[in-house]
Amino acid sequence: MPEITLRLFIFSLFLLVSQSVFAQQAIVAVAANMKDAFGEINTAFKSEGNRDVRVVYGSSGNFTAQIMNGAPFNLLISADGHFPIELYRQGKSIDEGVVYAIGQLVIISKNSAGIRLSDSKTELIKAINKANKIAIAKPDLAPYGKAAIEYLKAEGLWNIAKDKLIYADNVGIATMYVVTGAADLGFTAISLAKSAEVSKETNFMLVDSKLYEPIKQRMVLMKGAPQEALSFYRFMQSAQAKSILQKYGYSTP
């Protein structure tokens, strides 16, 4: 191969590799309870001139299993602290990450079901007895589902509720079961309960946070993540992101 042709070939190859690296888009796995809040945070992130990130919503447990099996997520924004720490223990992340928010569990009721929500145990028993189904996220996959079961047991409602439970892969799906009427009652995050889509079809009641383990939501950065993932990780800890989280009902560290 002539020298000039070889040089052109090497230069072209260098350009292709450089463009591929530059074009690498950060992929962020986000717990379903964060959907509305994260959408606003992502908009704020892009407004500062940052490149767009690819966002996938789902359950923290499913994302963790997928990352363990090689899924190319660069940043996990989890609904709890257990799954991110497990990724660190398995050598997938750069460290144990940080707690970015503390969530609140609520009960929601479909407006058309005519069920009254009250923090009176007597009224809650009436509501559960009247409900056709009660939607929760799978407790082994989603922290809000785990918290819901802890609450029901601590409040002495488990025995009357357990046979009416229907399980969803994540809290977003559990919420939609109530919105669509597949269930009359459900447990979800306050951030989802306050969203426009959900609030027009349901009403909600805050659950006593002393009756379930605090939902400390942690995020963790994977090894080899591109710069944009690191930038987003840092932005999630900014005053601007914390202000948005608080607006959606989260407490922040």
Residue ranges and their predicted role:
Residues 11-15:
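Hydrophobic helical h-region of N-terminal Sec-dependent signal peptides
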Residues 96:
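Active-site phosphate-binding/coordination module
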Residues 17-23:
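Sec/Tat signal peptide C-region and signal peptidase I cleavage site
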Residues 1-10:
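Bacterial N-terminal signal peptides that target proteins for export
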Residues 23-50, 54-56, 61, 65-71, ...:
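Exported/periplasmic ABC-transporter solute-binding proteins
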